[in-house]
Amino acid sequence: MRKFLSLLLVLAMLAGICSGCTKKIDNSGYVPTGDALLMEGQDPEDLMPEEEDAQELTLAYYPDRKLNPLFGSDYINRILMSLMYQPLFAVDNNKNVTPILCGGYQVSANSRTWTFYVDENAKYSDGTKVTAEDVLATYQKAKENDYYKNRFYHIWEMNLTEDGKGVIFGLDTPYENLPLLLDVPIVKATEVEAVIPLGSGPYIFQDSPSGAVLKRVEDWWCGNLKIPATDKEISLVAVSSAADVRDQFQFGDVSVVCANPMSDSFAEYRCDYELWEIESGYMMYIGCNILYSPHFDDGTLRTFLTYGIDRERYAQDFYKGMAEPVTLPAFPTSPYYNKALADQFAYDSLKFISRLGSYRIPTNDKGVQDNLVILVNSNDSARVRIARQLAKDLTAMGLPAATLEASNFKDVYYAQTWDIYLGMTRLSANFDLTEFFRPYGEMGKGGLSHEVLYNMTKNALENSGNYYNLYQKLAEDGRIIPVMYGYYTVYAQRGLMPDLAPARDNVFYYSLGKTMSGIQIDTVYD
């Protein structure tokens, strides 16, 4: 008992000592804010989430060129359009398709009937809903424009669904991936011919005496979606030429520009920049006059003419390497472009000379060998220089050749008074060659139409695995001979656009996170 009392006394003394040593902690230097502590002297605002740094973007535009996306084909103005408008589907630089305005789609079992529905949340900058009528009117108007019409070759009808909520596309041949062609910006049905129609994109064009700007849409239907452009207002600088665009980028405030190295007006950039190369769809090629040229009477020449075309040297000498030499009608990075197959038809002067030995060169009534006449558009100086060099090279290898340089290129082309022509065309994203080979096709002059190649083209549209067979047959036949493929060059001030991922016709490409499989409705069985 005495030990127990002694223990209690010791504990009591210890408690007293501890209480005497305890100091009251002064918490007045800290202010609780829920998820953070502020040090003495700090304001609560100091720990507020920081807004993303302003980019202070400035873009160039041509005020005298169209800003209606259904008619405006200028690639500088289309930079603005990629922020002002949205398509049913966006296509990245690798040809991957992502839904934007499309909220759902159906496809028939035979892939010839496609139905698309607008995302029910989609709105224009004025708050009105995007409708199926708008989509239909947009595509009907786009079909009239040379810039888009090549993607409509196999679309034979477009109508609203019975309930008016969707748009039906009827095709004359099965399509594996019709959405790849449906990246046309959608505008209101009542504004398809407006100078600057309203769009559903994150920015709206505003003009004033103090200058034009792109202003961020405050209540954008996509909310706070992160896109490459973050400014609330983007300044615009009016320009008048490609050289002006370059100078505004190199010495002025312009942040992002797009150029076409295959254009006669291309201005070279000589400053510090970040660069993206985006396939443009522009293909330079040779077309043969099978119907009227004596050089192609027996079809021999076109089977080996490809070996006499020094594509790599032409691309380097006349475009400073800013074009891709090709022997197949597709961009080299395309999944359809088979390099092993392409290499079989590349430049080989020895093979050309060897094959030329078994070819009978036509002669005139005096026994003089006829020149192979190369028609070329005299308004394209780079193409003229290539045609001249080609004529010189062929002549040196034993095939006399000369150029026919015409300012009225189309008239001479339709007259078909040439042997071959050095042409330029813009292929759709699926590299459709229909107009070369279908009966009475717009690009079939000189007898290029060909039933077998036309059917093989349709087979490739139905199943992309058939492109190899199509390209092999075409390269062996040689009625059209690809020379080089172009790309756009997108320049940005270094470090300014870390999230930029430009695509053809869509410099400010972005995705909403939707997927094709996620919005597909059950297949329709006929």
Indicate residue ranges for each PLM-predicted region.
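Extracytoplasmic/peripheral linker and loop segments enriched in polar/acidic and small residues
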Residues: 43, 50, 402-409, 434-497, ...
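N-terminal lobe/hinge region of extracytoplasmic solute-binding protein
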Residues: 60-109, 140
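Gly/Pro-rich hinge or "lid" segments in bacterial periplasmic/extracellular proteins
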Residues: 170, 175-235, 243, 524-525
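Ligand-site clamp/hinge motif
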Residues: 220-267
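Periplasmic-binding protein-like
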Residues: 291-335, 470-480, 484
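Structural transition elements
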Residues: 323-361, 379-383
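Ligand/substrate-recognition segments at binding pockets and active sites
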Residues: 359-427
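Long beta-strand-rich cores associated with HINT superfamily self-processing modules
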Residues: 493-526
